[in-house]
Amino acid sequence: MRDGDYRAANDVDLIISAGGDRGILDYFHKVVTDSAPVLGIYESDSTGFLAQLDVRDLEASLVRIDKGNFEIDQVFRIAVRVDGREVEPVLNDVAVFPSKSATLMEHVLRIDEKTVWRDNSDGLILSTPTGSTAYSMSAGGPMVLQKSQVFVVVSVNSLDNTRRPLIIPNDTTVEVADIVSRYHCEIVLDGGTRMGIKKSLQCSKHEVPAKLVRLSGNSSIISVIAKKVRLAEDLLSMPPSAKLLLKTLEYEGALSQRDLSTRTMLPERTVRLALRHLLTRGYVKKKTSLRDARQRIYELKL
């Protein structure tokens, strides 16, 4: 969509978003005002959480929508300010990490201007209930039902063994301040957009929710959580390299084998064996890169 199309997003009855969950996340980054409900579709060999409609079922589903056989879920977003500057809102999560992996980051967490902790960790994630089954969960956070009006705060791999994730009301203001690391730190919005940060991150509930079309009979948050629980049980028997690749793909999106080796600092042979394990288990799929037909990329199939 062009910028003008985004501004007219409330002048139509329905918006269809291709590209799976990433397409929906990108759309709601651009639209900060009220929008028509969004129907997300995904490729036939994948599944989605936000996008729950197989592209093969699109024609039949439009007939159901025309008859009014659908519901609209309103899910809240996070308003984000980086060093005092407002940036695009997020639907899943906002994370702050050092630009170099396996590097500690000092920070102070404040809620409604009151200091909750001072911590040294690999980073921090603030998620909505919608995002609680994404990167937040893989970092040790809880799974939260989508209609809950809460934020989830996770300090990733804290040096303090007693540090636990926080669940707080979403009418609070969350600030991550006094950020210090050996390397410059970055904000990551919904696992995609990155930008530098110097000192502080402020988050609050965005005044305009996202509207998502749900067709009756489609997978619910309960079934998604059940699938995530089965994955968590399977993770116990996975080699550490496979777990790391899963987390990296969830955080970074689709990557080539070489990219995975660079991001995780694992030898290419180890990455190759871990990918074979994940492909066999059905957690990852391999596809041809649209940028280079000779290159194969890997992405989650959850």
Predicted regions and their residues:
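Flexible coil/turn residues that form the inter-helical turn or adjacent wing/linker of helix-turn-helix
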Residues: G253
